[in-house]
């Protein structure tokens, strides 16, 4: 029943926008058809398969000269290990107030639908305002996103779209090169009525010809977990001097328990293009404090302290490119290399093949298991029970 109501809402927005808004709606999006094979490790099945049909639909409508309405929806049909993994992620989701995406079961698949964005934007002469379910992003980091604490990233899934937050922001432009922004985000607990856990703050962006600087402060209201609230201080810098350099950091301060460097998440790296742009390389290091914004259990994904991400993209021609990437953890010497081959048959339609091989000391010489290995340890440090030795995805993507 909920799925039908959501479908009716989408139809109403798309069709009714012709009458509600002054301009024609602009509908765009992407569809992905993906087949997965996973060679299991530990207690996982030795071989498993799955199929996913995914669509991201985006609606943009102008009304007058200053206002824009945005909406985005994710539609998916799953079978096999895709559905099994979705159910597992839902059961393990760190936010107990967040329900996983509901699924409706068909003849040989399960279908899901979720609202991704729903907000408006007002463009003023000096002040811009956005409000609704939207992305409020911070920092210039390309991989780890230390400053981007409202929308945490995971480079193991580079194509994943960050979830939105319910909130608003107002941006003021004293001069063309300077932006001052105030923002507010609702608590993670949607049942909170007293403002506990609400996040509000300020950011500043200054741009020069070859460099940009962002400073950020955010305060999270006291709640039942953090009785004195949480302070966050961010600084992000990028510079284009032959190489493109980036420094992106966020310090999380809990007044009840000052944890020194453990509250710091800091990414630093560079990118560079060679051979007329045919070869692109990027490397970015992450220091992940144990109670920082990128740490597991504090909104992030990582259990150790020191990581390195590297990637190289080579374009054979206008239609075909190969991407080689890896994530390496210095603490337990585990790493996860993966390769992606993309071929564009015609404009807007491409085929892709991705393979990932989790590795650690246990795989190579019988040592200890690592976070990025086939069977990673549990978050509490205990021995893991299941994982994957090899993962391969074959897919087709259509953009419109």
Question: Which sequence ranges carry the predicted segments?
Answer:
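Repeated loop/turn-to-beta-strand initiation elements of outer-membrane beta-barrel proteins
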Residues: 25, 65-69, 126-129, 177-180, ...
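Outer-membrane beta-barrel "beta-signal"
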Residues: 343, 353-357, 373-400
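Detector for outer-membrane/organellar transmembrane beta-barrel domains
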Residues: 208-210, 238-329
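Transmembrane beta-strands of outer-membrane beta-barrel pores
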Residues: 33-39, 63, 75-79, 124-126, ...
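Residues on the lipid-exposed face of transmembrane beta-strands in outer-membrane beta-barrel proteins
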Residues: 55-61, 117-122, 168-172, 202-206, ...
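Residues that define the transmembrane beta-barrel architecture of outer-membrane proteins
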Residues: 45-53, 111-116, 125, 162-166, ...
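Outer membrane beta-barrel
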Residues: 60-180, 360
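Transmembrane beta-strand segments of Gram-negative outer membrane beta-barrel proteins
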Residues: 22-40, 71, 178
């Amino acid at each position: 029943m909920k799925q039908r109501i959501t479908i009716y809402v989408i139809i109403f927005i798309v069709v009714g926008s012709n009458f509600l808004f002054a301009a024609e709606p602009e509908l765009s999006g992407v569809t992905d058809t993906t087949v997965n094979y996973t060679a299991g490790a530990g207690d996982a099945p030795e071989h498993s398969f799955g199929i996913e049909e995914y669509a991201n639909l985006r609606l943009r409508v102008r009304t007058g000269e200053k206002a824009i309405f945005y909406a985005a929806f994710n539609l998916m049909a799953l079978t096999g290990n895709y559905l099994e993994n979705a159910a597992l992620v839902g059961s393990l989701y760190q936010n107990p107030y967040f329900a996983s995406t509901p699924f409706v079961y068909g003849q040989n698949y399960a279908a899901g639908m979720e609202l991704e964005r729903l907000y408006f934007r007002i463009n003023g002469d000096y002040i811009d305002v956005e409000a609704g379910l939207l992305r409020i992003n911070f920092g210039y980091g390309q991989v780890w996103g230390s400053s981007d604490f409202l929308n945490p990233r995971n480079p193991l899934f580079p194509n994943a779209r960050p979830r939105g937050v319910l909130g608003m922001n107002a941006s003021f432009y004293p001069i063309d090169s300077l932006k001052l922004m105030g923002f507010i985000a609702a608590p993670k607990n949607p049942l909170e009525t007293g403002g506990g856990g609400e996040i509000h703050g300020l950011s500043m962006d200054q741009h020069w010809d070859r460099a940009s600087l962002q400073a950020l402060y955010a305060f999270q209201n006291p709640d039942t977990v953090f009785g004195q609230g949480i302070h966050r201080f961010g600084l992000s810098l990028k510079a284009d001097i032959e190489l493109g350099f980036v420094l992106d950091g966020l310090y999380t301060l809990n007044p009840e328990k000052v944890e020194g460097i453990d509250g710091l998440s800091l990414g630093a790296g560079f990118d560079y293009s060679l051979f007329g742009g045919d070869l692109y390389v990027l490397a970015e290091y992450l220091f992940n404090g144990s109670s920082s914004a990128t740490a597991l259990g504090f909104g992030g994904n990582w259990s150790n302290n020191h990581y390195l991400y590297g990637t190289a993209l080579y374009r054979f021609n206008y239609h075909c490119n190969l991407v080689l990437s890896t994530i390496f953890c210095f603490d337990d010497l585990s790493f996860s290399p993966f390769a992606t081959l993309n071929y564009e048959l015609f404009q807007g339609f491409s085929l892709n093949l991705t393979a990932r091989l989790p590795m650690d000391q246990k795989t190579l010489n019988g040592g200890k298991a690592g976070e990025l290995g086939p069977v990673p340890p549990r978050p509490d440090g205990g021995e893991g029970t299941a994982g994957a030795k090899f993962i391969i995805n074959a897919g087709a993507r259509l953009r419109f």
